[in-house]
Amino acid sequence: MKISRISVYQVDLPLEYPYWLSGGRLKFECLDATLVKIETDEGHVGWGEGTPWGHTYVPAHGPGIRAGIETMAPFIMGLDPRRVLNVERAMDLALPGHLYAKSPIDMACWDIAGQSAGVPIADLMGGGSRTPKPIASSVGAKTVEETREVMDRYRARGYGLSRWSAARPSITPAVSAASSSTFPPRSVLPW
């Protein structure tokens, strides 16, 4: 089995609620996602995704992912995607570092490996947990009232944890107090 085609797609992912960071100076309403589709000569198709925060927040950003994939693609064409370590070595040769750009390719290769083996990817990696884990919401509202409202909505939808980032440091104590009545103790995690 060999990688025969790599397709890259840019997708805007709108956020349900605006997310504020850096003391209310950065507002995110949409994330720049990159989807990678890897096809093989035997008809298998694997998908991977990279969705970092905006380029003003972390070095990883959507255009960087896409440029990195363009750089690495010639080095991994023709390789067996099930031999993930070989693919990783080829990516490292083409572009040292830049894990955020390699991750979507890695995911797509694992997707193909799981499909071709007929098992979930978790089984290929040593077995998944059958114990349910709580899912955390992520809240970055600008005011205490907005934070509480968004946390209440997530809680009503079944989220057992919430992580929040205060848009202004001065509201941190008030957000902590407001969130403790929405979520049980130790289930609210400030960033």
For each predicted feature, which ranges?
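Structured loop/turn residues at beta-strand edges in well-structured enzyme cores
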Residues: 1, 67, 103, 131, ...
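N-terminal amphipathic alpha-helix/helix-capping segment at the start of soluble metabolic enzymes
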Residues: 1-5, 9-11, 89-92, 114-115, ...
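Structured beta-strand/loop patches that form or line metal/cofactor-binding pockets in enzymes
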Residues: 1-45, 51-56
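Metal- or metallocofactor-binding catalytic centers and their adjacent structured scaffolds
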Residues: 5, 39-116
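A generic structural signal for short
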Residues: 24, 97-99, 138-139, 168
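A common structural microfeature
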Residues: 33-35, 44-47, 102, 132, ...
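Glycine-rich, aromatic-flanked loop segments that form ligand/cofactor-binding clefts
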Residues: 100-101, 106-142, 146
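Metal-dependent enolase-superfamily TIM-barrel catalytic cores that perform enediolate-based chemistry
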Residues: 126-191
